[in-house]
């Protein structure tokens, strides 16, 4: 979460990461089995947080989330809003259960590797937006509010929002491939103006 910049603003874009926590789990292979295997063979592992290391190929949750993601996309395509919402809740519950002391797989390194990575992703994204010449006025868990300090038509503002989302997505693809040798499942979307 970012501090807000109080004021009245015109032409504010909202960009939002699509299912941020599940996409972090998919991208960085965050998973209980992956944690155990990553600690056994740390030289090939993906760095997590608080000492966590995750196996690049021995895991199960990222694959389950990928399957659910595809089912959700199909539900959206078929305009099945109830099914899409149910799958979204199910995918997000994977993070919740890993952060619950009652879960047999509970390990603070799992939940921390999701939330702390999410925080870093949001901070980096805000920095990139500001480097592109726009002002970030607020951010929460997975959304960033961007002020376009100019007189624009709704169409112009929407075009900037779409372009900004494409630019950020490409930056994340490049960044994660270069830094971690991983495919990126993060996707930011222009939500509204």
Where do the model's predicted regions map?
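Conserved acidic
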Residues: 1-193
């Amino acid at each position: 979460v970012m501090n807000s910049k109080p004021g009245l603003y015109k032409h504010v874009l909202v960009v939002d990461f699509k299912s941020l926590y599940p996409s972090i789990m998919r991208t960085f292979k965050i998973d209980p089995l992956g944690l155990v295997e990553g600690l056994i063979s740390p030289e090939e592992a993906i760095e997590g947080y608080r000492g966590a290391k995750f196996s690049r190929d021995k895991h199960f949750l990222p694959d389950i989330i990928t399957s659910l993601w595809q089912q959700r996309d199909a539900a959206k395509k078929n305009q099945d809003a109830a099914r899409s919402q149910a799958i979204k809740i199910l995918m997000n519950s994977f993070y919740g259960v890993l952060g619950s002391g009652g879960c047999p797989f509970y390990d603070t390194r799992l939940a921390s590797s999701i939330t702390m990575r999410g925080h870093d992703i949001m901070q980096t994204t805000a920095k990139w937006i500001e480097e592109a010449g726009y002002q970030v006025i607020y951010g929460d868990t997975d959304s960033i509010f961007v002020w376009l300090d100019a007189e624009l038509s709704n169409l112009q503002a929407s075009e900037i929002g779409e372009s900004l989302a494409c630019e950020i997505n490409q930056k994340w693809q490049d960044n994660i491939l270069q830094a971690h040798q991983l495919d990126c499942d993060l996707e930011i979307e222009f939500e509204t103006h």
